[in-house]
Each structure stands twice: as C-alpha cells, then as structure tokens.
A protein has these predicted regions:
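Basic, Lys/Arg-enriched alpha-helical interface segments
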Residues: 1-64, 73-79, 86-100
Length: 100
C-alpha cells in the first residue's frame, strides 16, 4: 500500500516519542500489505474499527494513541486523516475528521 502523509507520522512521534516504534511498525506492515477489502485488515489487526467511508481506526501503542486512515483499496493507497492521543480522539468524529 502507498501511504500518503508519512510526515504526519514523523511529526507525531517527535512530539510523542513513545509512539515512534509502534508507528514505524504499523507503517512497515501497511506499506508491504496488499489490502483489497476490510476483512484483509481485520485479519491482521483484530482490534481495528471501521467507521464508514472506508475509514479505519487503528489503536497505536496499546490504545494510547489512535490513527484514522482512509483506505482506497482499488488504488492501494492509505490516506492519514487523524493521528492523536486517545483523549484527542474522544473529541473528534472519526467518520469525518480531516486533521492529518
């Protein structure tokens, strides 16, 4: 998969060093994945949530942080829509946020 907005991940882990290794691991796994449908993601990430419009919520570092992406399965692309602490996630609408 092609991941759009890698800089968002880097900026976040500079502010939250505890998230660096989990985000790098997610990036490496997602980059080499070939997800064709939501079930492909769910097989690898059991705790993932789907919130409509091809949006996927990943728990990062044991649920301390949340990553919301939009997946364009047909184009094998992932667009980062939100990355924040769990507290920040609680204040947004995961289905519509565009704050990457």
């Amino acid at each position: 998969m092609r991941i759009v907005a890698l800089g968002t991940l880097r900026d976040f882990w500079k502010r939250h060093p505890d998230a660096e290794q989990p985000l790098k691991a997610w990036y490496d796994e997602a980059r080499t994945a070939a997800w064709a449908r939501p079930q492909d993601i769910k097989r690898h990430y059991a705790s993932v949530s789907f919130v409509g419009r091809n949006r996927v919520v990943f728990n990062i570092k044991g649920n301390d942080h949340r990553l919301i992406v939009a997946v364009a399965y047909r184009f094998q692309s992932i667009y980062i829509k939100f990355l924040g602490t769990h507290a920040a996630y609680d204040r947004i609408n995961a289905a519509t946020v565009e704050d990457a």
